[in-house]
Amino acid sequence: MPHRTAEVRLLDHGYSREARSLLYHAYRHDPTFAYLFESERPGFDQRVRATVRELVQQHFAEELPAIGLLIEERLVGIALIAPPIRRLDITESWSWRLRMLMTTGFRCTKRYLEYHDAVLACLPPGPYHVLPLIGVHPEFQGQSLGEQLLTALHNWCAEDSGSQGVVLDTGNPHYLEFYKRQGYEEIGEVAVGPIIEHVF
């Protein structure tokens, strides 16, 4: 597919609806989400949609940064960024936990929180930017937009002299080599049910 260049833009809550739609499509086939939100049980799509909605709404409500890629004003890629001093706030919010319990159920919320805590436990000491959600819309994958999104993200995070880097994770083996080509080094592995989540 041809390489396309997208406009890089810092996003605010006005992009919440587009962000939720994009991230839902990016994560609905993710093996980690399939385990966390029980893809074998009816209602899986609704649980993924609800989780993405709650994460995105809380992210923008706390005025945390997000970088987007736009082509002809359509959001095609996004990275939600949790700066070093704020990265734990979302899952520690009781209102967020309550909304998750009501929309995804106790077992899925518990699984998600355990996964989140296990990933954060892999972080080395020091301040890092963490990416709770990152994705390129499936219709636009294979066009080097993932590379463009990560470059924009790295440039933005580099402006914070107090940060030692960016941390992300994936349980999708398809993305392992991609992240390594972008210069990421694996710092840990987390067992998420039958899935091995790689932390970079």
Feature locations, PLM:
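Conserved beta-hairpin
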Residues: 62-79
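Conserved beta-strand-loop-alpha-helix junction that forms the acyl-donor binding cleft
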Residues: 132-141, 167-177, 193-194
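A short beta-loop-alpha structural element at the N-terminal edge
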Residues: 7-25, 29-32
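Conserved acyl-donor/pantetheine-binding loop and adjacent beta-alpha core of acyl/acetyltransferases
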Residues: 75-135, 141
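Active-site rim helix/loop that mediates acceptor-substrate recognition in acyltransferases
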Residues: 41-65
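Conserved acetyl-CoA-binding loop-helix of GNAT-fold acetyltransferases
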Residues: 136, 142-155, 181
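Conserved active-site alpha-helix within GNAT-family acetyltransferase domains
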Residues: 147, 159-163, 171-189
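Conserved catalytic-core motifs of GNAT/GCN5-like acyltransferases
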Residues: 167, 185-199
